[in-house]
């Protein structure tokens, strides 16, 4: 009977190859949280026992000195917004510049994704323009990776809920169906589903009309469900994924008077002026 092959990530393998003292130290750290290491980091090729109890480098130091893609991505995810944590305007501008550059230009997809995610959690309005540009620059990667980056940018823009990003989100939803492979069609549908969810953060009639249009014209179940969820978020009403039911709520004046959130349906003319 053949024995099971050794797994380098198993404790007994580590004990044989690193020595029992090192293995014990690793186990102690992982079980008690005394070291800033994860199991993936311990079992990675770059792991060194001598660094076991070494404090992690600050994110800015990593970004200024390291070319390791994984380390840089982790550092980008760890950056905090200076102004929200007692920092100065100068520090804020520096961090925004670092994140924006990574979101738009980094050669590593994971670094772009982490930078975009972090910008989505910032309150700084400058992040919005960077996120929009990150969406458009995602095309430098292969289609599947580009779709992931675009979707992350749309999620981040939805968190900001800034009217400057409304044009991009609606543009994605109004793009014609893709003529191409099944993969290309699915990539574009993933974008549209993400955009429909992001639109739930914009309590504007332009948003509700776009979402209503999805219920009227689209057949994809996931996209229709995303549109319904966003309409529910905007209006506070719970209705089925049905165009007629939502059309009545949004356009019938009597039904609108009974709606719990009367402020969501703004005058379309006013909205048109705001969206320019």
Give the positions of each predicted feature.
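Terminal, low-structured helical/coil segments at or just beyond the last alpha-helical repeat
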Residues: 236-276
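Bacterial Sec signal peptide processing site at the extreme N-terminus
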Residues: 29-54
